[in-house]
Amino acid sequence: KRKASSAGGARQQVVRLQNALIHIMQDADKLHYEGRYKYLKPIVDKVFDFPFISRVVMGPDWPKLDTEQRKQLQKALAKLSVSSFAKEFDSYSGQKFVYDSTRSMGRGKLVRYVFHSGNDRIHFDYQMHKAADGQWKIANVIVDGVSDLALKSGQYRSLYAKKGYSGLIAWIKKQIEAKAKASV
């Protein structure tokens, strides 16, 4: 019984995100980018583990950041994630997420869904783990075999090495602004 509720908690977080994504797609014309962003922000903040994600993407450079820089990076990554969802999930024509499976993965879970959009099938694998608050949270999203965390890790570490912390944050902010402008 405990195992089922454990897997259910992990899956429930994914369902919470997906329900929000379907909602913003269905109401995309009414919400526009800003409305989609505002609707998603509290949900994304609740279901993703941005403290963990920040540590992973910074890797060996994480200890070099002070507490304020860490918090700022976590907030920037959260805003970037929300802006990406708000930009990409901007119209609805019957798309749906279909549950595939949940399996144990080390101390975490891998929750798989298939996104049906017309004839396209896109696999979303959500790597879940227990966050510091004891809740299941999304640590990584793998879309058709491509890990978002791996992509960001390489990109952000390279930016940090070349431009320093302020350059990295400035770049993330520019990405957020670009997504907002592209959605107008």
Predicted regions and their residues:
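Soluble periplasmic/extracytoplasmic beta-strand elements of cell-envelope proteins
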Residues: V15, A20-I24, V98, R112-V114, ...
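Low-complexity, intrinsically disordered terminal/linker segments enriched in charged
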Residues: V143-V184
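Surface-exposed, charged secondary-structure patches
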Residues: S83-D125, I172-V184
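A mature extracytoplasmic/lumenal domain signature
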Residues: L77, S101-R103, V114-S117, M128-K130, ...
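Intrinsically disordered, low-complexity linear regions
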Residues: Y39-P42, D49, I53, S104, ...
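Early exported N-terminus immediately downstream of N-terminal targeting peptides
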Residues: A7-F85
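Short, low-structural-confidence N-terminal segments
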Residues: K1-S6, V184
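Short beta-strand edge/turn micro-motifs at domain boundaries
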Residues: R121-L151
